[in-house]
């Protein structure tokens, strides 16, 4: 795989009328969607805590909007492929250690925990359109694949 090079930062997004209409329609449903995502999140945590799936903890000072549900697995790319083979899409949100790009790290600091996320963090479906059957399929599949692949051994160093 080719290494991505980031030379500068910036933004070029310009909202158009159709995007503005989408945002307005979404805002009108936000409370309902948030409740659904929160319920899914709580269900996942309850099941996964009892099945040995390592869930990314949220800092005590934050309130999650549950737009992602992140777990740690020993090999996130293999995990995502195995999930895909079972018909479940995962997202690999944490794919780069941005502190390694000079344009994004002007003070030349290191962020050692970032490499852990790059190697182990994968997000499973947690959106408001999931049916109960789909949620249960995600849970069952995550638990089976997690039992095969395992969890990373160095997670304790992140939160100690």
Task: Name each model-derived stretch.
Residues 1-160:
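PLP-dependent aminotransferase class I/II
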């Amino acid at each position: 795989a080719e290494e991505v090079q980031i030379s500068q930062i910036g933004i070029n997004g310009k909202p158009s009328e159709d995007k503005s209409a989408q945002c307005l329609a979404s805002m009108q449903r936000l409370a309902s969607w948030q409740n659904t995502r929160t319920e899914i999140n709580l269900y996942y945590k309850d099941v996964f805590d009892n099945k040995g799936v390592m869930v990314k903890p949220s800092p005590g000072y934050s309130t999650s909007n549950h737009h992602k549900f992140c777990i740690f697995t020993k090999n996130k790319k293999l995990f995502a492929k195995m999930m895909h083979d079972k018909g479940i899409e995962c997202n690999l949100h944490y794919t780069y250690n941005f502190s390694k790009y000079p344009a994004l790290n002007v003070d030349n600091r290191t962020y050692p925990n970032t490499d852990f996320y790059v190697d182990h963090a994968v997000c499973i479906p947690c959106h408001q359109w999931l049916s109960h059957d789909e949620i249960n399929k995600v849970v069952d599949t995550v638990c089976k694949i997690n039992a095969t692949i395992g969890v990373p051994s160095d997670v304790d160093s992140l939160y100690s």
